[in-house]
């Protein structure tokens, strides 16, 4: 049978399930897949397949995650589910799973638990702005008032982390019953997905964002000038556009792109995802280097000091064997290069153990083009020992 071609007729949205262990994230994922598949008369992804998540490597870190896809009437979704708590943390911090929104699963039998809180905080830190709540296992709670109490608790918890707790949609039901085909619960899953369709907005396309390209390599073409090559991170670049070279130096240099090449062919326009070479007017070979970025003028600045949410690899994952303290000086790998920085731990945190997730302050020795939400890795002698997301720019 010929392989199906992916026809892009509906807008694409990335979502995931988050919440405490055993509250039913994977069961809900399987139920959504089944209910939507049956509506369209196609085969669903079953529970065992989702639960047996394959290992992936992202930025040198091994993560177990399942990706499944499904469609509603108006959208195409890629849905991410991770089996273990550590997998969630790593997923969100490394950006392996970019989520446009998420379904927070809370068991009505338990109410919010420690990881419920952690996942809400993580979503806030890494920029997942839209959450829809699914109160699961409501069939196991006899007292309707208890379910309402749990809902209130969840709403308060969301508000505590600056989500609109009073306005976030909360859907109640049983993922397991829906998976078993209970008609009433199938309707609940349909209602949940209608809510996700309407509440989680369509993401802004990468091509609509301001142009940014981390520089991977620089070379000279005799008689033509300096070429910077790399993968366009976002936005669109057209020949003749003025751009800035930002990072590693205090001053920002302006230049004009006089030519764009991809696979040895000349292009008029490059867009997010393209690997290109950009010919830069009036730039000497020594005025630009790997680790800088080409960017739309005024869209990104250099910074040295910021706060970050960081996951520190455990010894088993190939990370450090010993804890680190304030004044730890590893390299921070941003865009395409390592820059040394000094770590300052928050008050009351004496040390950070391998396997910990922590927020701390970093001061780099050279300025780097940084913005909130940027992902980086922490390295020692070329080995990855952690991964982080910039949560707040300080200087």
UniProtKB/Swiss-Prot annotation:
Known EC number: 3.6.5.3
Primary localization: cytoplasm
Chain residue ranges for the region called G4: 136-139
Location of region: G1: 19-26
Domain annotation tr-type G: ranges: 10-204
InterPro entries: EF-Tu_GTP-bd, EF-Tu_GTPase, EFTu-like_2, EFTU_2, G_TR_CS, P-loop_NTPase, Small_GTP-bd, T_Tr_GTP-bd_dom
Entry keyword annotation includes Repeat: no
Compartment(s) where it occurs, according to its Swiss-Prot or TrEMBL record: Cytoplasm
CDD domains recorded: EF_Tu (cd01884), EFTU_II (cd03697), EFTU_III (cd03707)
Taxonomy, superkingdom: Bacteria
GO terms for MF: GTP binding; GTPase activity; translation elongation factor activity
Stretch list, region G2: 60-64
Residue span of region G5: 174-176
Keyword field contains Metal-binding: yes
Catalytic activity: GTP + H2O = GDP + phosphate + H(+)
Keywords: Cytoplasm, Elongation factor, GTP-binding, Hydrolase, Magnesium, Metal-binding, Nucleotide-binding, Protein biosynthesis
One term under GO cellular component: cytosol
Subunit and interaction comment: Monomer.
Task of the protein: GTP hydrolase that promotes the GTP-dependent binding of aminoacyl-tRNA to the A-site of ribosomes during protein biosynthesis.
Protein name: Elongation factor Tu
């Amino acid at each position: 049978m010929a392989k199906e071609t992916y026809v892009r007729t509906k807008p694409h949205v990335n979502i995931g399930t988050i919440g405490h262990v055993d509250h039913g994230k994977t069961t809900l994922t399987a139920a959504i897949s089944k209910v939507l598949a049956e509506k369209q008369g196609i085969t669903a992804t079953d529970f065992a397949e989702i639960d047996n998540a394959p290992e992936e490597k992202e930025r040198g870190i091994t993560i177990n995650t399942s990706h499944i896809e499904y469609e509603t009437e108006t959208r195409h979704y890629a849905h991410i589910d991770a089996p273990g708590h550590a997998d969630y943390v790593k997923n969100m911090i490394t950006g392996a799973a970019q989520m446009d929104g998420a379904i927070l699963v809370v068991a009505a039998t338990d109410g919010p638990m420690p990881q419920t809180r952690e996942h809400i905080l993580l979503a806030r830190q890494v920029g997942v702005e839209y959450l829809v709540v699914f109160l699961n296992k409501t069939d196991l709670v006899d007292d309707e008032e208890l379910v309402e109490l749990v809902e209130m608790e969840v709403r308060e918890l969301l508000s505590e982390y600056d989500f609109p707790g009073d306005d976030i949609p909360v859907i109640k039901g049983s993922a397991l019953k829906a998976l078993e085909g209970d008609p009433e619960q199938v309707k609940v899953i349909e209602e949940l997905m209608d809510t996700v369709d309407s509440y989680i907005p369509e993401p802004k396309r990468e091509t609509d964002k301001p142009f940014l390209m981390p520089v991977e390599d620089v070379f000279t073409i005799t008689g033509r000038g300096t070429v910077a090559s790399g993968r366009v991170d976002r936005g669109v670049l057209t020949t003749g556009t003025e751009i800035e070279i930002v990072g590693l130096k205090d001053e920002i240099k302006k230049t004009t792109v006089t030519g764009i090449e991809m696979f040895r062919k000349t292009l008029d326009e490059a867009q997010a995802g393209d690997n290109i070479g950009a010919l830069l007017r009036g730039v000497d070979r020594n005025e630009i280097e790997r680790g800088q970025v080409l960017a739309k003028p005024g869209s990104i600045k250099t910074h040295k000091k910021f706060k970050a949410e960081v996951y520190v690899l455990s010894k088993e994952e190939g990370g450090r064997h010993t804890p680190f303290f304030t004044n730890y000086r590893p390299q921070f790998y941003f865009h395409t290069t390592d820059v040394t920085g000094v770590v300052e731990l928050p008050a009351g945190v004496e040390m950070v153990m391998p396997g910990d997730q922590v927020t701390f302050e970093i001061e780099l020795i050279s300025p780097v083009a940084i913005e909130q939400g940027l992902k980086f890795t922490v390295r020692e002698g070329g080995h990855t020992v952690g991964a982080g997301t910039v949560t707040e720019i300080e200087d």
